[in-house]
Amino acid sequence: MISRQSRVCSDAPSGGSEPSAGIGAVPETCTVLPTTTARENPATGSNGECPEIKRRSISGLVSRPVDALRQIDDWDVPFAVAGVSRPEGTVATRGDTQSAVRLASVSKPVTALAVLIAAEEGVLDLDEPAGPPGSTVRHLLAHASGLPFDGTVPIGQPGRRRIYSNEGFAILGQHLALRAEMPFDEYVRAAVCEPLALALDPAGHPGAGMHACLDDLLVLGRELLEPTLIAAETLAEMTAVQFPGLDGVLPDFGRFTPLDWGLGVELKSGKSPHWSGSRTSPQTFGHFGGSGTFLWVDPVARIACAALTTREFGEWAKTAWPRLSDAVLAEASRG
């Protein structure tokens, strides 16, 4: 059984920021910002001004995608922050990198990483039963369990269709807690947050309720480029197509044949249009969230890019995110 002990949970203050309904309190080092549906303030920084781009001098980088990040100044959102990282560290950021927002579905890769750590530790097996009859942990991670977006009554047979399911990740969280014999959020803190020194708060829905700041996501992106918490072979399995050939609907983007998915991460493969833009490689993986968040990792370009906003995903993001992503890669490729 897992030998890690959660220090984050025991050290958490009893007061501090008030949590959103159903969501645990966020560490005092983070300022939690609400998600909105429209522009409330032209600022992209929490102080009402646009923080300057922060550069990190990293040996060996041929180019730093700095100018590309200025695009977020033109986004019609109350708050925006974006950044780029490589395995060596963070390349550049623009905006307030320490204010936390709800990640929405960007929570799913965090949960997936915790589940994969548990699998390596022998806490659970990816192919053990979990969820509806015939489903396994692997099915739940890959949205192939037959469960609907919400609700516990299956609408398909496991392994037959790619049905995007928040409920599947709720069940994953329960299953991990049962097998680890500790609360889900405590396991994530001990297995993921503490080793990576993240302020990320894993309380709430395992597939939609976590809070984090940009600094956290950029560290997570580096971890998914060069893992330290899981073996390289496990990362390869995470980013390989699970149950190949399944058709499905990518939320807000439509039907794809096939709709490739890994273990808790969406795989770009041949999808077009795609929220990560046209310059990212087919090997790119990651997730976007309905609260206006995204993280993609391109193992070919060796770059991770993330953005957090407080405006719900919509048509604005379908244009803004690919444009930003393409500019980041274009600038990074220039020697």
Language-model features and meaning:
Residues 205-208, 212-214, 240-300:
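Active-site Gly/Thr loop motif
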Residues 102-106, 118-154, 163-164, 178-207, ...:
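Active-site helix/loop module of the DD-peptidase/beta-lactamase fold
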Residues 246-250, 314-335:
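Short, gly/Ser/Thr-rich active-site loops of penicillin-recognizing serine hydrolases
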